Amino acid sequence: DIKIEHITSIIDSMEPVEGAIEFLQGLESKWPTLILSDTFSQFAKPMMSKLGNPTLFCHTLDIDDTGRIEGWNIRCEDHKRKTVEALTKLNFKVIASGDSYNDTSMLSSANAGILFKPPDNVIEEFPQFPVVNDFEGLMSAIESSASDMGEL
């Protein structure tokens, strides 16, 4: 019987990808920043703490009093795309970055979409998005997109 404490202790033993903390700090110093993820808040909490607790929109788990996972609650279907659409309806300019197929509807809905370290099949299927492979390249692509939108 796997309990939430077992899973979160494993996640807590992990460290952020090298450069992630500095990247997020740099991003947040310039623009409001949201992380949209298909994870669950209870899984993400240890890592988000190490990243300085950035704003995270994701799903939640149902956990009983003993710590056993009983189920999950999906915020809404395709929540990344819907979040970007809501922000653009509020006249925010949105630059989105993602690494996989499940991010492409979000990238398409944003004012600018950037693929970050995607697998080859995603690059091939979505050639309209620029591809970057490190945090320095991602920051440059974001800054360039922001400049093009008059947001720098």
Question: What do the predicted segments below correspond to?
Answer:
Residues 33, 37-38, 93-133:
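Acidic, Mg2+-coordinating phosphoryl-transfer loop and its flanking beta/alpha structural elements
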Residues 1-32:
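A metal-dependent, Asp-based hydrolase signature
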Residues 64-71, 123-130, 140-145:
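Short, charged, surface-exposed secondary-structure boundary motifs
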Residues 56-63, 118-122, 135-138:
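Short, acidic/turn-prone active-site loops that include or flank metal/cofactor-
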Residues 20-51, 55-60:
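Substrate-recognition element of Asp-dependent hydrolases with the DxDx(T/V) motif
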Residues 41-45, 103-104, 139:
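Short, well-ordered alpha-helical microsegments
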